[in-house]
Amino acid sequence: MSMFFYLFLLVLGLQATIHCAPHNSSEGKVTTCHLPQQNATLYKMPSINADFAFRLYRKLSVENPDLNIFFSPVSISAALAMLSFGSGSSTQTQILEVLGFNLTDTPVKELQQGFQHLICSLNFPNNELELQMGNAVFIGQQLKPLAKFLDDVKTLYETEVFSTDFSNVSAAQHEINSYVEKQTKGKIVGLIQDLKLNIIMILVNYIHFKAQWANPFRVSKTEESSNFSVDKSTTVQVPMMHQLEQYYHYVDVELNCTVLQMDYSANALALFVLPKEGHMEWVEAAMSSKTLKKWNHLLQKGWVELFVPKFSISATYDLGSTLQKMGMRDAFAESADFPGITKDNGLKLSYAFHKAVLHIGEEGTKEGASPEAGSLDQPEVAPLHAVIRLDRTFLLMILEKRTRSVLFLGKVVDPTKE
């Protein structure tokens, strides 16, 4: 079973003293989400969001050399788009330009409707695929946010809003951590350890994903200890899952890499990209929405003897400096402009925390099903087939089929490093 849990926090602080009456914001889940009429932006969003994902990936890879990389691009895009809804002037322009949108070509209303459509589509119930994305805003009791902002973020982003006493740091920290733990089904515990004073608003964005492999691995086929090359001088031992199955795959001669698609039983797929030794940076530089479209067109189904490591990794980032380097400067500066959130001056973005957890294993079946269940059409005599062994650094993407969204993106450098 393959499971992913993701958390993204935006922490905002006030530089000026706020004088206003306490605001009792509404609490509780948003249970309805109405899809807007489709517009031109909807058709551009998958490509724009994918290109943002790869730009952010390249920044994180440079900032975290030789480390595992893992994050949820679609969640970050949705959280920043939500933040842009309450921003103005150059603050808003920079946020949207970092995401890849040009306000000259894309009206703000169409953009917001596009994200509303995306979130509603991703949250659509499915018996075989657990996928839920949502937001929560924890607002200081002394701050009175604009009613329009509260209404809009509920309608567009399925956002829960909580009135929080940030003067009681330990209680506020416990409230947020409890919420995060509940929404990630216990996978992220105690996220915030040292909440600072003078924080007035925290935005939490989360995504929970759990899916079955369409063709689960047999536990009995897993090699308990197999070599995985971290670099030229380092080799680690990992459990290696093994299966002979028909997969869509493609050898990209131009980029010197092998691409393999593993389907989940519902509307999602995993894309593994294995560069030839010494060609990782070449592949990373070439990653784009056009590259994904090319691979999607050229993937061919055939028998593959596949070896995939069984592993768990997690990644935590403060994306503040990264987003500023990408061009989102004003939101973190004294000149930050958030007139759509509150009439009070001095509100700016202080932190942008991100945490993601990944587990990939053989199970791929519902609870209670036999772990030895396998493909019914696996041949007794192996036909002529390709062999793909993910035994060195590889790229990993999880995509949702209906919206063509990049749910998760990462690089596995060392599968033993959690």
Curated annotation (Swiss-Prot):
Which residues take part in binding thyroxine?
296, 401
What do the Gene Ontology cellular component annotations say?
Answer: extracellular space
Give the molecular function GO annotations.
hormone binding; serine-type endopeptidase inhibitor activity; thyroid hormone transmembrane transporter activity
Q: Where is the signal peptide?
A: 1-20
Instruction: Give the subcellular location.
Output: Secreted
The alphabetized list of GO BP terms reads: post-embryonic development; response to corticosterone; response to nutrient levels; response to peptide hormone; response to prostaglandin E; response to steroid hormone; response to vitamin A; response to xenobiotic stimulus
Q: In which tissues is it expressed?
A: Expressed by the liver and secreted in plasma.
Pfam families from the UniProt entry: Serpin
Name the UniProt key words of this record, in alphabetical order: Glycoprotein, Secreted, Signal
- Glycans attached where? 24, 39, 102, 168, 227, 256
Lineage: superkingdom: Eukaryota
UniProt keyword Lipid biosynthesis, yes or no: no
**InterPro entries referenced in this protein's UniProt entry, alphabetically:** Serpin_CS, Serpin_dom, Serpin_fam, Serpin_sf, Serpin_sf_1, Serpin_sf_2
Q: List S-S links within the chain.
A: none
Q: Which family does it belong to?
A: Belongs to the serpin family.
What function does this protein fulfil? Answer: Major thyroid hormone transport protein in serum.
Q: What is this protein called?
A: Thyroxine-binding globulin
Q: What is the originating organism of this protein?
A: Rattus norvegicus (Rat)
Lineage, opening ranks: Eukaryota, Metazoa, Chordata, Craniata, Vertebrata
